[in-house]
Amino acid sequence: MKHSLKYNLGIFTSLPLLPLLYFQGKNIRKNVPTLPEAKETTGFVNNNFSSDLHILTIGESTIAGVGVDYHKNGFTGALAKKLSTKLQKNIHWRVYARSGYTVAKVTTKIIPKIKETKVDLIVIGMGGNDAFTLNSPKKWLRDIENLIVSIQDKFPEAPIYFTNMPPIKEFPAFTKTIKFVIGNLVEIFGSELKNKLQSKKNVFYYDEIITLKNWSERNNLSHENSSIYFSDGVHPSELTYKIWANEMATFISSKFKA
């Protein structure tokens, strides 16, 4: 109820800003370079452990590795390396993601294409595109439910881990207006997801809100140079993928039962 009220108040506040959002969004799309998705969607981290783990990462542009050349240098590659060390397992990894996809599109366009039969854990990174398209929290939760069901139909035993929401309020390419409207909306999505998953078995959400200040302090990096975290003002840099993946690996390893 609290988050629905926050959303409704946000809509009321944002309505006069919609024309401005439209023109600012067009200007950002014109000025931000279109970066390709990362190459090589499969990999293997072999640390000579006695057993292997098979993981899938699923999602939007961040999981698709926009901002780096190869997935081994992006979120999934960094996640696999850190998980291998933390779980003492060799890691087979595979990426299923597409830039620009919402949760609904991932469910209908990507999940049916998954060919693997053996999967030990699944990581999902979503939220940005659903916020950019101004989906409501109600639709967001409905689409999340459909996504979870479609994955669990294929892999009923595999735990599912949702990453934090993207830190839209930190994107240097975005205007204050876009950060306010879209940034608040994606945080509502995160809160709604957290509440929903409390009653879900074997599905987890890392709910920490990402801030560059926290990341800089934890990793002894300068607070003054936010550009090191972004490849184009919107998508992560290789550094960001590594920091984000390492934190996600710590969260997963705290929940995962081999």
Describe the function of each predicted region:
Residues 144-149, 190:
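Generic structural signal for well-ordered alpha-helices
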Residues 103, 107, 141, 145, ...:
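Short, amphipathic alpha-helical "lid/cap" segments that border enzyme active or binding sites
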